[in-house]
Every structure is written in C-alpha cells, then in structure tokens.
UniProtKB/Swiss-Prot annotation:
Name of the coding gene: Trmt112
Tissues/organs with expression: Abundantly expressed in the testis, also expressed in the brain, heart, kidney, liver, lung, muscle and spleen.
Quaternary structure note: Part of the heterodimeric BUD23-TRM112 methyltransferase complex; this heterodimerization is necessary for the metabolic stability and activity of the catalytic subunit BUD23. Part of the heterodimeric N6AMT1-TRM112 methyltransferase complex; this heterodimerization is necessary for S-adenosyl-L-methionine-binding to N6AMT1/HEMK2. Part of the heterodimeric ALKBH8-TRM112 methyltransferase complex. Part of the heterodimeric METTL5-TRM112 methyltransferase complex; this heterodimerization is necessary for the stability of the catalytic subunit METTL5.
Record family assignment: Belongs to the TRM112 family.
Matches recorded under InterPro entries: Trm112 (IPR039127), Trm112-like (IPR005651)
Tagged with keyword Nucleus: yes
Species assigned in the record: Mus musculus
A Pfam entry, by short name: Trm112p
GO BP term (any one): peptidyl-glutamine methylation
Protein's name according to its UniProt entry: Multifunctional methyltransferase subunit TRM112-like protein
Localization terms from the record: Nucleus, Nucleoplasm; Cytoplasm, Perinuclear region
Keyword Nucleotide-binding attributed: no
Amino acid sequence: MKLLTHNLLSSHVRGVGTRGFPLRLQATEVRINPVEFNPEFVARMIPKVEWAALVQAADTLNLAEVPKEPTEGYEHDETFLRKMHHVLLEVDVLEGTLQCPESGRLFPISRGIPNMLLNDEETET
C-alpha cells in the first residue's frame, strides 16, 4: 500500500463518521519500489493530500523527508517533488495494520493490500 493510498482511506465503521480519518499506520514490512518520476502528477496530487495525515504516516515509518507543510512554489521545486514522489509513490507498506482512530478497529494490510471490509454488525443500516 502506497502512502498516497493511505492518505485516501478512512474507516466506515458504524457511528464513526468523519472521525475515522486518518487511520493509524502500523507497518511490519515496508519495501521501496522505484517508480518513474512524474513531476506533473506529483504536483497535481500535493493539494489533494491531507498533509497532517501524511506527516503522521511518514513519522511512523521514520521517513524524515516530509516537511511539516508543502514548500512555497513546490510546483517548480524538483527537489521537493522528488522527495514527495518517493514518499507518496515508492514507499510500499506490504504488511501491517491500519487502525481506526475512533473505534480502534484494526484493518489488516497483507501483501500491500489493505482489507477495509467490515462485518455486517459494523456497517450502517
């Protein structure tokens, strides 16, 4: 699971609502998978990223590259875009869990795929 994906996921356990984001990341296996650098794509994604959640996830994985906020004029800052490309697209969580901050529900990550399926009693009716 890429950190870009993590930044888009939230818990939909009954009664949680918007308090199901960001999911707490606990990784037991992480791999770096090189991906071709596309500065235009990264620049388009930066405004869509929930920055505090990205910083929290990066801190959990001991990734020091993530600044506390995007740099001014990041669209033209290749160094910044390369760092964010690495963090968002090349860091791959293969095994671990995601935890709902409100309910505490754990969602497993297996072979890079987060399982967000809920039991019937956990869903809204």
